[in-house]
Curated annotation (Swiss-Prot):
Protein name: Chromosome partition protein Smc
One of the GO biological process terms: chromosome segregation
Subunit structure: Homodimer.
Cell compartments where the protein resides: Cytoplasm
Similarity comment text for this entry: Belongs to the SMC family.
Task of the protein: Required for chromosome condensation and partitioning. Binds single-stranded but not double-stranded DNA.
Domain SMC hinge: 521-627
GO molecular function: ATP binding; ATP hydrolysis activity; DNA binding
SUPFAM superfamilies according to UniProt: P-loop containing nucleoside triphosphate hydrolases, Smc hinge domain, Tropomyosin
Cellular component GO terms held in the UniProt record: chromosome; cytoplasm
Note on domains (UniProt): Contains large globular domains required for ATP hydrolysis at each terminus and a third globular domain forming a flexible SMC hinge near the middle of the molecule. These domains are separated by coiled-coil structures. The N- and C-terminus interact to make up an ATP-binding cassette-type ATPase domain. The SMC hinge domain mediates dimerization and binds DNA.
Length: 1177
């Protein structure tokens, strides 16, 4: 960051004509001097050289007043000049030099001159350089005398504008203003273009329809002509293709007819042979599927049932074996547990007996000890002894009774446990019973169902056998009848084919119908109306006429229209009519050959029609004679080769026409025979299907009958087993219930005995207590007490002994009555299970052997059955194959016969059709000559759908009529106006895009402007609060935006709370408080955005020493970042400075000198004394 190294003044204010150099420290420089010495003029000089324009700010009336006015010893200066030297080592100025010198001179007339590093410069150039280094003559970093509170006196808006300036958002406002100007211009341009577009669009809309109509008219004209040519070309191509295909097809038909006739004969022989073989196979099937096959099937069923029964026996035995093995393992495990319990019980009994013996010995010792005491006591009181003996007797009896009571309680517990076990077993068995009963019911139902099904199957088998015999007889009868009908139909179809062919050759049915319609003016077909003079030319004339032979000659076009209407109404097809009043005859050069019209006879009234059909044709003798004239004239040879004018040549075998025959009755007969044959075939096929169905059903029922009998046998066995199991469960439940009753009786007896014992114990206890009282002798009390203690011990030992004996008895009872018997029972059960397992294994083995024998027998029977079935299956397959072959052969024969008939009709029809097509082809080629050759050549693709082309032609002709009259000039006019319209539209789109871009740019500017401002404000606000707290310990202050949401619509308020005082608005503060607040604001800005230097003139004037000290400390700290030049009269401020400059006034001229701190202190002290200014004020 640059800083001021020195200041040079000459003729500036009070500094005289000589050059004065004022050096500054990089950090904190203090300027001191008496009032009026000229120290504040240094601040004015800095403001001046930086380009300041306000004379008032520099404490002058006008700018020329800054020139030295002279003194007693010096004349007035001719100009005032100030040079400021900046250190630029860090290149804060955008000048590549270590020092930047700015010089300004003002003349008496107010003119100013500027220099930059010795080079003349303009003020704006100087300001630009200063701005680049963040220096401004109007900056907040220059606070002249009395200006410190200007920050406080600012309006909220001015303070906010100061933040605007610090944040650098002015550039955003500049950009926005420029963008708004551009936006305004864009909107004006848009408005002008919109007016033009509107006007041009009116013209364009008007011209568009006229232009579209004109273009459509021209396009339709071209398309129409092209479509007509395309239609002709398409029709010609189709006709040529049809003629070629027809000739090829006729040759194929002749060859195919010969093949079919041979094939029909061959098939007839093959059918006869196959029918013979079929009858032989049916006889063998009947024989093979007789009684022997049924007996084998029955035996297989019986053996299969035995196998299933044996398998079931093995399965049951295995299940029982598995169950026995499981029970054996379970019983062995239980025996192991019982043996373990026995050992445990024996061990426990031994242990308890040892403890019992020990207790008996101990009781014995205690009783001996007690007897000694009793003897002593008896010596004291003889009566006491007798009482004591009775007491002891009662105690002994009480102990014995108590022991018995414990024994009975143990018995009751054991009996109850046994009872609970029996109850659990009964519950288990009762839960099992419903399942067994359910299965019994299921198997009963199965048995009944199986018996019913067996009966039903046997009935069905009888019915099927009867039906089968009946169907076989019907098949034989129908087969004989079918053979007879087929022969008759074949003969009739041959007759019909011949008749139909002759009729097709002879004439056109539709023409015949027309002649019988009663419409006047119909003469007949050309074939009927002409006669060949010489038979040698008959073939040539027939070929030359082609399809035109069937053209109908009529009086005029009205007759033709009536005939066409008749054909439509009666759906008789289509015919070509030759109206004599409209048809134009054709002519030919007779020098090439014999004109075709010369070899025929006809009525002169139909001459136009005859010459239309044959007038352009000549007859030549051979192909050699025709060759030189191909493509020049239409020719036909005597043998029937046809040469078209187009160059097309038609030739090959040609069948002449025969006489017509009436075929109505013959056709009816054929149709009747066909229907009968189809009916017989359908019936015969249905009967054969029914027979096969009956055979299959019979076989399936026999198999099912065998299966049902097996299932019945198995179900019956399962039912018997379940009934036995149900009885066993019921018997076990009854036995368990009987045992429970016995146990309950025992429990009741034991409880009764227990109640008696408890009553006896109560009586003995009362007697014992009474005897105790009798024994209470004061003289024997001590002995009695000892005896009582011993009695208590004996009693406790005896009670324990009683419990032990009861426990031993309980253990021995469980051992002898439960464990040992259970052991014997389990051993017996194990022996029984082992025997059962061995027996089951033997049973399984025997059954498996029997099963093996049965399987072998079944395999043998199945082999026999399979051989029979295989033979029958083979025969049936052969029969089926033969039936299918015969059916296919008959179908094939019928197809061939129909095909033969169709081919013969088709051959004759093709002959007639080809002649018609040739005539049509010549007509189309003639029509094509009316169109431009280039147009014809331009059509590369011939349409396929000619009907569609015809509809398009009609549609185009209709549209052309609707468009007339047409303004052709509208095409050119529209193009001119349209270009203008599109240019304007393009221009408008660009203008609209430009407008949107400007609006988007403005929005971005506003957004970024606010973000930059808020970041600046938040940082300065934070700094302000921190610095104010330092300058006024215990106080607080903050900056407040009037409108935080839209900061640019409001100002910036300052709210401060000096230490120990309430929050105050600026207006209510004292001078010192205002100064502190203002300084906090300045230093908050300095901390956020340090300026290169700060110039403060007597900012501490209203502060006490404590506040001055804090301000001075803050300046000292801030001088590490920026240069500070402070004009002051306070020693506290001066004491913190890095450099002190003294200013004095002599003879009206200010002098500058560098001072030490001591010297500066003395000068200040002298100034105070001289001016009566007390320290601290």
């Amino acid at each position: 960051m640059p800083y001021i190294e020195k200041l040079e003044l000459k003729g500036f204010k009070s500094y005289g004509n000589k050059k004065v150099v004022i050096p500054f420290s990089k950090g904190f420089t203090a300027i001191v001097g008496a009032n009026g010495s000229g120290k504040s003029n240094i601040g004015d000089a800095i403001l001046f050289v930086l380009g300041g324009l306000s004379a008032k700010a520099m404490r002058a009336s006008r700018i020329s007043d800054l020139i030295f006015a002279g003194s007693k010893n010096e004349p007035p200066a001719k100009y005032a000049e100030v040079a400021i030297y900046f250190n630029n080592e860090d290149r804060g100025f955008p000048i590549d030099e270590d020092e930047v010198v700015i010089r300004r001179r003002v003349y008496p007339d107010g003119r100013s001159s500027y220099w930059l590093n010795g080079r003349r410069a303009t003020r704006s150039e100087i300001l630009d350089i200063l701005t680049a280094a963040m220096i401004s003559p109007d900056g907040y970093n220059i606070v002249l005398q009395g200006d410190i509170t200007k920050f406080i006196k600012m309006s909220p808006l001015e303070r906010r504008l100061l933040i605007d300036d610090i944040s650098g958002i002015a550039e955003y406002d500049s950009k926005k203003e420029k963008a708004l100007e551009e936006l305004k211009q864009a909107e004006e341009n848009l408005a002008r273009v919109d007016l033009l577009i509107k006007e041009v669009k009116k013209q364009l809309d008007k011209l568009e329809k006229e232009r579209n109509d004109a273009l459509r008219y021209l396009d339709l004209k071209d398309k129409l002509e092209k479509a007509k040519v395309s239609l002709l070309l398409g029709e010609i191509k189709i006709l040529e293709t049809q003629i070629k295909e027809g000739e090829k097809r006729r040759a194929e038909i002749e060859e195919e007819i010969q093949k079919i006739e041979k094939e029909i004969e061959k098939i007839g022989k093959e059918i006869v042979e196959k029918v013979k073989v079929l009858r032989e196979i049916e006889e063998r099937i009947e024989k093979e599927s007789g009684e022997e096959a049924i007996q084998i099937t029955k035996k297989i069923g019986e053996v299969t049932s035995k196998i299933e029964l044996t398998k079931r026996n093995i399965e049951v035995a295995k299940e029982e074996l598995e169950d026995a093995q499981r029970r054996l393992a379970k019983t062995k495990e239980e025996l192991r547990k019982v043996l373990s319990e026995i050992e445990k019980s024996k061990g426990a009994i031994t242990r308890w007996k040892k403890r019992r013996d020990a207790l008996i010995n101990e009781i014995k010792k205690k009783e001996e000890e007690r007897n000694v005491l009793v003897v002593k006591l008896g010596e004291i009181d003889k009566t006491f002894g007798a009482a004591r003996e009775e007491f002891d007797s009662v105690v002994k009896e009480l102990e014995e009774t108590t022991r018995k009571m414990y024994e009975i309680e143990g018995n009751i517990r054991r009996l109850q446990e046994e009872k609970e076990k029996l109850h659990s077993r009964i519950l288990f068995l009762r839960a099992k019973l419903p399942g067994i009963k359910e299965k019994i019911n299921e198997f009963k139902a199965v048995v009944e169902d199986k018996r019913a099904e067996i009966s039903e199957i046997e009935g069905k088998l009888s019915t099927i056998q009867a039906k089968r015999i009946k169907v076989e007889k019907e098949i034989e009868a129908k087969s004989n009848e079918l053979e007879k009908v087929s022969k008759e139909l074949e003969s009739s179809e041959r007759e019909l084919i011949a008749a139909e062919a002759q009729r097709e050759v002879r004439g056109n049915r539709a023409a015949e119908e027309l002649k019988r319609s009663g419409i006047g003016g119909i003469y007949g077909t050309l074939a009927e109306l002409i006669k060949v003079k010489d038979e040698a030319y008959a073939l040539a004339i027939e070929v030359a006429l082609g399809n035109r032979a069937d053209n109908v000659v009529v009086e005029d076009e009205l007759v033709a229209e009536k005939a066409i209407k008749y054909l439509k109404e009666h759906k008789l097809g289509r015919l070509t009519f030759l109206p004599l009043n409209k048809i134009k005859p054709k002519h030919v050069d007779s020098s090439v050959g014999l004109p075709a019209v010369d070899v025929i006879e006809y009525d002169q009234k139909i001459e136009n029609a005859v010459k239309f059909a044959l007038g352009d044709t000549v007859i030549v003798n051979s192909m050699e004679e025709a060759r030189p004239h191909i493509g020049k004239v239409r020719m036909v040879t005597i043998e029937g080769e046809l040469y078209e004018r187009s160059g097309a040549i038609t030739g090959g075998h040609f069948r002449a026409r025969g006489l017509a025959v009436d075929t109505t009755k013959l056709r009816e007969k054929v149709e009747s025979l066909r229907r009968r044959k189809e009916a017989l075939e359908g019936e015969l096929n249905s009967l054969k299907i029914e027979l096969r169905s009956l055979e299959n059903a019979s076989f399936e029922l026999r198999i099912k009958l065998s299966d049902e009998k097996k299932e019945l046998e198995l179900a019956s066995k399962d039912l018997n087993r379940l009934l036995e199991e149900e009885n066993a469960v019921k018997e076990e439940i009854e036995e368990s219930e009987r045992k429970i009753q016995e146990i309950e009786q025992k429990i009741e007896n034991e409880k009764s005995e227990l109640a008696k014992l408890r009553g006896r114990i109560q009586r003995l206890e009362r007697k014992k207590e009474k005897l105790k009282k009798a024994l209470e002798n004061p003289e024997a009390r001590e002995l009695m007490e000892k005896i009582r203690i011993i009695d208590g011990e004996i009693s406790s030992l005896k009670e324990e002994l009683s419990r032990i004996e009861s426990r031993i008895e309980s253990l021995e009872s469980r051992l002898n009555e439960e464990l040992l018997p259970r052991k014997a029972s389990l051993e017996e059960e194990i022996e029984g299970l082992v025997n059962k397992i061995n027996a089951l294994k033997n049973n399984i083995s025997e059954n498996e052997k029997a099963l093996e024998l049965l399987n072998k027998e079944l395999e043998k029977l199945k082999s026999i059955e399979e051989n029979i079935k295989g033979e029958i299956r083979t025969l049936r397959e052969k029969r089926k194959k033969l039936e299918e072959d015969i059916s296919k052969l008959r179908e094939k024969k019928e197809v061939l016969q129909r095909k033969l008939q169709e081919l013969e009709i088709e051959a004759n029809t093709l002959k007639v059709r080809d002649a018609q097509l040739n005539a049509q082809l010549e007509e189309k080629k003639y029509q094509l000559t009316h169109y431009d050759k280039n147009l014809i050549k331009s059509i590369k693709e011939i349409p396929l759908d000619l009907e569609k082309v015809k509809k398009e032609i009609e549609k185009m002709e209709e549209e052309i009529r609707s468009l007339e009259p047409v303004n052709m000039k509208a095409i050119e006019d529209f193009e001119i106006v349209e270009r203008r319209y599109l240019e304007l539209k393009s221009k408008r789109e660009k203008l609209e895009a430009e407008k949107e871009s400007i609006i988007e740019f403005i929005n971005e500017i506003e957004k970024e402007k606010k973000n930059v401002f808020m970041r600046t404000f938040e940082a300065i606000s934070r700094n302000f609060s921190e610095i104010f707290a330092k300058l006024s310990p215990g106080g607080s202050a903050r900056l407040i935006l009037e409108n935080p949401e839209d900061p640019f619509s409001g100002g910036l308020e300052i709210e401060a709370k000096p230490a120990g005082k309430d929050v105050k608005r600026i207006e209510a503060m004292s001078g010192g408080e205002k100064a502190l607040t203002a300084l906090a604001f300045v230093f908050a800005i300095q901390k956020f955005k340090p300026a290169p230097f700060y110039l403060f003139d007597e900012i501490d004037a209203h502060l006490d020493d404590a506040n001055v000290k804090r301000v001075a400390d803050l300046i000292k700290e801030s001088s590490k970042e920026s240069q500070f030049i402070v004009i002051t009269l306070r020693d506290v401020m001066m004491a913190n400075a890095d450099k002190i400059i003294g200013v004095s006034m002599r003879d009206g001229v200010s002098k500058v000198v560098s001072l030490s701190l001591e010297k500066a202190m003395k000068i200040l002290e002298e100034i105070r004394k001289k001016q009566g200014w007390e320290h601290g004020n």
